[in-house]
C-alpha cells in the first residue's frame, strides 16, 4: 500500500429533503430551508400514530436517466414492492457519477462501497404483519406449520433481500461497476467507515475510483422504537447543542461520493472538490444506545484523524458535528471536542446539518459530509438552526449565522453512532 497516494473527491450526489442534486441542496442550505412534514402511519386502514419527518418531495426515479430496463428488472425481482430506499441509493449514485464526468459503463477500475442500516426492513415488517393478519383472519384454526408455509410463500423473496449484499448487488449491476465492493453497517458512522475503506482500497492500488453511497428511508417502526427510547423530539425541530434540546427526527435521503486516485483525476482533468487527508476510528464496545461517557473513545477517534492528516487542532477550520440533538449524545460530543480544542473557542467553527435534513440514520454521516464538502467549495459555513441558546454546560460555541470566507480550507467531520462506532475524517478544499 502506498501512503503517498492521494485521494480526492471528484463527484457528489446529495439527495434529501432540501434538494435533489448539489445545486438545489446548496441553494436551500444558504436560504436555511427545510421540509418537515407530519407523517401519518397506518397498519392497514387503522391509524397508529404520527411522526415528524424531513420529507423528500416529488421524487421520481425515472427522472434520473437510469436505464429503464434495469429499473424494470429490479421491480420484477422485488415483486412490485415499495423499494424507495434502493431508489434513493440509485439516484444518488447516478447524480455523483454524472457530476464526476467519469466513464462508468462497464468499468473494472471502479469499486463500490454501500452503507445502510437495514435495507428493506420496514417494508418486510409491513408485509409480514399484513399477510399474517389475513391468514389468521381467514383460518383461525390454522396449524403453526401451515401458517409458516403460507407466510414463507409470500415473504421468502422479501426475506432473502434483507441480506445486505443484495442492496450492493442491485446498485453495482445498475451501473456496471465491477471493482472492489463492500457493504458497511456501522450505525450512524457507517458513511465515515465506508469512506475510509474506499480510500484504503485506492491507496492499495486495487481500484482507481471507488463510489461510496448510502441511503435510508426511516418509517414508523423505527420511530416507534427510537421514540420509545425518548430520542425523538416532540415539536419536529432538531436543536443540536441547545439548552432546550430534546431529540431528533428522521430524514429521507441518500448520498454518493466519487473518490479517485489523485493522479488519475488529474490525467482526465477532473474537477476536484476536496482531498481526503485522513481518518480516525474507534469502537466503544459498551452499550447499544448510549455512548461510553466515562471513556474517551470519541476523542481518540478525532485525535487519530488529526494525526493521520498531519494537522494540528489549530489547522482545522470547520467541525461538522454529529449534532443529534439529544441530551447525552450532544454532551458526549461536546466533551470530546473541548478536550481537544479547548472551551468556548472561536475557531474552528462548529456546525451541524441535521436541523436541515433530519437524521438519515445509516447514511447520515455520508450525506452530511457530502453537503459539507459542497459548502466548503463555496467557502460557506451553514449556521446551526434551532439553537437559540447553546447549553452553557457544553462550553462550546456554534455558528449562528452563515459565514462566507475564502480562509475556510479544512473540515473535520465527526460522528458517534449506536453501538459505540466513532469516526472522524478530515478533508481539505481542492484548490489549496
Predicted regions span which residues?
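Condensing-enzyme catalytic core mediating Claisen C-C bond formation in acyl metabolism
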Residues: 6-10, 33-39, 49, 236-309, ...
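Acyl-CoA/ACP chain-elongation machinery
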Residues: 37-43, 206-241, 245-246, 279-293, ...
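Conserved beta-ketoacyl condensing-enzyme motif
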Residues: 9, 33-182, 215-221, 313-331
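Glycine-/small-residue-rich "gating" segment that lines the acyl/pantetheine channel
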Residues: 136-152, 196, 200-203, 217-267, ...
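ACP-dependent fatty acid/polyketide chain-elongation machinery
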Residues: 1-75, 263-275, 370-385, 423, ...
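Active-site-proximal alpha-helical scaffold in enzymes
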Residues: 89-102, 164-175, 181-214, 250-270, ...
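Short, well-ordered amphipathic alpha-helical segments that serve as non-catalytic structural scaffolds
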Residues: 88-100, 167, 261, 294-310, ...
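Active-site pocket-shaping loop/turn-to-helix segments
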Residues: 23-24, 71-91, 155-160, 181-193, ...
Amino acid at each position: 500500500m502506498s501512503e503517498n497516494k492521494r485521494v480526492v473527491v471528484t463527484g457528489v450526489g446529495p439527495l434529501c429533503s432540501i434538494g435533489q442534486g448539489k445545486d438545489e441542496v446548496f441553494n436551500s442550505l444558504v436560504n436555511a430551508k427545510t421540509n418537515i412534514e407530519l407523517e401519518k402511519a397506518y397498519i392497514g386502514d387503522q391509524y397508529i400514530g404520527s411522526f415528524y419527518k424531513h420529507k423528500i418531495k416529488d421524487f421520481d426515479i425515472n427522472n434520473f436517466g437510469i436505464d429503464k430496463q434495469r429499473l424494470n428488472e429490479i421491480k420484477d425481482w422485488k415483486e412490485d414492492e415499495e423499494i424507495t430506499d434502493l431508489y434513493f441509493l440509485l439516484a444518488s449514485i447516478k447524480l455523483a457519477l454524472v457530476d464526476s464526468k467519469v466513464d462508468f459503463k462497464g468499468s473494472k477500475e471502479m469499486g463500490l462501497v454501500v452503507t445502510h442500516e437495514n435495507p428493506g426492513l420496514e417494508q418486510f415488517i409491513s408485509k409480514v404483519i399484513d399477510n399474517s393478519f389475513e391468514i389468521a383472519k381467514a383460518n383461525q384454526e390454522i396449524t403453526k406449520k401451515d401458517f409458516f408455509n403460507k407466510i414463507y410463500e409470500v415473504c421468502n423473496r422479501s426475506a432473502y433481500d434483507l441480506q445486505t449484499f443484495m442492496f450492493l448487488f442491485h446498485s453495482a449491476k445498475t451501473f456496471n461497476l465491477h471493482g472492489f465492493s463492500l457493504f458497511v453497517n456501522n450505525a450512524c458512522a457507517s458513511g465515515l467507515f465506508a469512506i475510509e475503506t474506499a480510500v484504503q482500497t485506492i491507496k492499495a492500488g486495487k481500484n482507481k475510483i471507488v463510489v461510496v453511497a448510502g441511503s435510508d428511508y426511516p418509517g414508523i417502526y423505527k420511530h416507534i422504537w427510537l421514540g420509545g427510547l425518548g430520542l425523538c423530539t416532540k415539536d419536529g425541530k432538531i436543536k443540536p447543542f441547545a439548552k432546550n434540546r430534546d431529540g431528533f427526527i428522521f430524514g429521507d435521503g441518500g448520498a454518493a461520493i466519487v473518490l479517485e486516485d489523485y493522479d488519475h483525476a488529474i490525467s482526465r482533468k477532473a474537477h476536484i472538490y476536496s482531498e481526503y487527508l485522513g481518518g480516525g476510528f474507534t469502537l466503544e464496545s459498551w452499550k447499544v444506545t448510549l455512548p461510553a461517557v466515562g471513556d474517551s473513545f470519541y476523542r481518540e477517534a478525532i485525535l487519530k484523524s488529526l494525526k493521520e492528516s498531519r494537522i494540528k487542532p489549530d489547522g482545522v477550520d470547520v467541525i461538522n458535528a454529529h449534532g443529534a440533538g439529544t441530551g447525552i449524545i450532544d454532551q458526549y460530543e461536546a466533551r470530546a471536542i473541548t478536550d481537544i480544542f479547548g472551551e468556548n473557542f472561536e475557531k474552528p467553527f462548529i456546525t451541524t446539518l441535521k436541523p436541515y435534513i433530519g437524521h438519515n440514520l445509516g447514511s447520515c454521516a455520508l450525506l452530511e459530509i457530502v453537503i459539507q464538502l459542497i459548502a466548503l467549495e463555496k467557502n460557506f459555513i451553514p449556521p446551526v438552526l434551532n439553537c437559540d441558546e447553546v447549553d452553557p454546560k457544553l462550553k462550546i460555541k456554534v455558528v449562528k449565522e452563515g459565514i462566507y470566507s475564502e480562509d475556510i480550507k479544512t473540515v473535520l467531520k465527526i460522528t458517534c453512532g449506536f453501538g459505540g462506532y466513532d469516526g472522524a475524517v478530515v478533508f481539505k478544499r481542492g484548490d489549496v
